[in-house]
Amino acid sequence: IYIADVPTPIFLPFGYFPLTQNRATGFIFPSVGQNNDRGYFIQNGGYYFAPSDFFDVTLLADYYTNGSYGFRAESKYKVRYKYTGSLSLRFENLINGERGLPGYSKNNIYNIRWSHSQDSKSNPNSRFSASVNLGSSNYFRESVNQLNTPNFLNNTLNSSVSYSKTFRGYPSVNLSLTASHSQNTRTQTVNMSLPTLQANVERIYPFVKRNGQKKGILKNINLQYSLRGENRIQTSDSLFLKKEMFNDARYGMKHSIPLSTNFKFLKHLSVSIGGRFEEIWAGQTIKRNDYDVINQIQGKKDTIKGFDRFNKYNFNASIG
């Protein structure tokens, strides 16, 4: 800097930093290394691009000199004031040993992750959310990609996808539909609920107007209705997402209608009367055979497939 044409040792730092609001498209440089079982490798190399302002895509790949390879596709999306989420698809083809020698094996493993959340203000009457983590039970244990190392000790995979909606009016109806998944990566057992359906109708007074005065035994009669249906599946990792996993599905539905009323008796006593009706629909039932008294053998249980139904009733009353 010159002051009055006299040079001084003082200087001002200067730099140019271009700022952009757009995401840059380009190649992702891979990491290079060596694995004792699969030779030299390149990992996590690929390409990134953003087709629009609402989502982007990352494509990555791995390759090992023994022939093993892996692919990953990841995407993040967001629509302002509506929803946001991410999706990850991972696949690896792993080769162990050398072809023609003992110990040679070839294995495909995969993992799927999806998260989705809805802005609470986008639609107050309906909501959709998802948190999915499913795939091969041995994915995180056998994957040789460095990105999966933190999940090596993960023993469970859980997923849940739900949708709920409220139908306004009188009576209002709340409806929810949920699919869930729980997977033990050690025992390779998979438990699912595909789906669980719930519906609830608000309390109604059939013998009085909506905002009318409720007096007497008749006008105080009120009832509700609720429904719950579920389809449960227990299977193994080897049968997951195959048609055989539906062979032992257990499904059913329960209808419930509570009914009650209250009134004054002798001006000072309050009387409450109520009851409940339930009907259960089942896709299969269990028949218990009689106990064998002579041989002292407990009767066997037979599973009978096919639709069946039964009812339950109860009644209650109180004075206070």
Where are the language model's segments positioned?
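Outer-membrane beta-barrel proteins and related beta-barrel translocases across Gram-negative bacteria
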Residues: 1-320
